[in-house]
A protein has these predicted regions:
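Alpha-helical support elements that line or immediately flank enzyme active sites
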Residues: 48-72, 164, 170
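Hydrophobic alpha-helical membrane-insertion signals
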Residues: 1-23
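Catalytic-loop motifs flanking and including active-site residues across diverse enzymes
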Residues: 50-51, 55-59, 83, 102, ...
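Active-site-surrounding "flap" and adjacent substrate/cofactor-binding loops of secreted or lumenal enzymes
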Residues: 62-90
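Asp/Glu-centered strand-loop micro-motifs enriched in Gly/Pro and often flanked by an aromatic residue
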Residues: 35-50
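Short N-terminal secondary-structure initiator segments
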Residues: 17-35
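Predominantly the structural core of cysteine protease catalytic domains
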Residues: 2-8, 29-34, 40, 60-64, ...
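Conserved aromatic-histidine-acidic binding/catalytic patches
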Residues: 46-51, 94-98
Length: 276
């Protein structure tokens, strides 16, 4: 094949009626642009390697995006993906297993514990089950998400979030064609064919859309040599299909009065859940 396939790791969230839904600002919904591309504002694409830490990578990407956009903290700060991956598995009681995690739990972890820098807790996949040092948690408290909301399975809300200038994290079902040389070269992912086999679940970050092609622009965590310099596109139909994508979340580090994101201190922020 010529390209070594990385790992996946998205586990679907359990239903929770307490999830607060994102509400895109009405003025933006009334005049949605035909396309949005946040890639120029994104941090460098990560590479998760052979570890099922895609949720930690996706959440870290959204977190770093927000810090850059809102000009918070040091410019050389890169969030520790392994810190997020460990703490989301603490919530789920699976720290000793590399079986992935739920996006909601990963976001709850950066609300409660925050996230230290990768300089403090590096991305060494052999240490995935090791608890970060006390200093990492102390640093994490200085870098916490303030609010988070679930984005509805609605094209206007998804587009509205992106048009507002913020990405959203989500998970999708991966089929065989995603691992093909063609996708690795072009970054163009089509709807799965009837006889394709499911190979896993993957968490990624939506960073744009284009009405002309009816596709979302997605940030992956397989390095810059894969796809379109680390990005790929998915049809609108992929994200609105209940069998193909789920768990759409957007986070904020500074409260935005223009939309009703959930306060981090709200109910259930630390409740334990088990994976499906």
């Amino acid at each position: 094949m010529g390209y070594k396939i990385k790992s996946y790791g998205w586990q679907p969230d359990l239903p929770d009626r307490r999830d607060h839904l994102y509400a895109a600002p009405t003025p933006i919904l009334m005049a949605l642009p035909s396309k949005v591309d946040l890639r120029p504002q994104c941090p460098a694409v990560y590479d998760q390697g052979q570890l099922g830490s895609c949720t930690g990578n996706a959440i870290a990407g959204a977190f770093e995006f927000d810090r850059m956009k809102q000009r918070i903290g040091r410019k050389d700060y890169v969030p520790s993906r392994l810190f997020i991956y460990y703490n989301e598995r603490v919530i789920e009681g699976t720290v000793d297993s590399d079986n992935g995690a739920q996006i909601r739990d990963g976001i709850k972890s950066i609300v409660k514990q925050g996230v230290c820098s990768e300089a403090t807790w590096p991305y060494d996949i052999d240490q995935f089950a090791a608890k970060p040092p006390v200093a990492a948690y102390a640093e994490g408290k200085k870098n916490q998400a303030l609010a988070y909301s679930r984005v509805a399975r609605s094209l206007p809300q998804m587009k509205g979030c992106l048009a507002s200038g913020f990405p959203f994290v989500f998970g999708f079902t991966v089929y065989e064609s995603f691992e093909s040389p063609a996708v690795a070269k072009t970054g163009t992912v089509d709807m799965p064919k009837p006889k394709e086999q499911v190979v896993g679940g993957h968490a990624v970050v939506a960073v744009g859309y284009n009405d002309a092609t009816e596709r979302f622009i997605i940030r992956n965590s397989w390095g810059r040599k894969w796809g379109m310099r680390g990005y790929f596109t998915l049809p609108y139909l992929y994200l609105v299909d209940t069998n193909l994508a789920d768990d759409f979340w957007t986070i904020r580090l500074v409260e935005d009065p223009g939309q009703s994101a959930r306060r981090a201190v709200g109910r259930g922020a630390g409740r334990k859940r088990r994976r499906v």
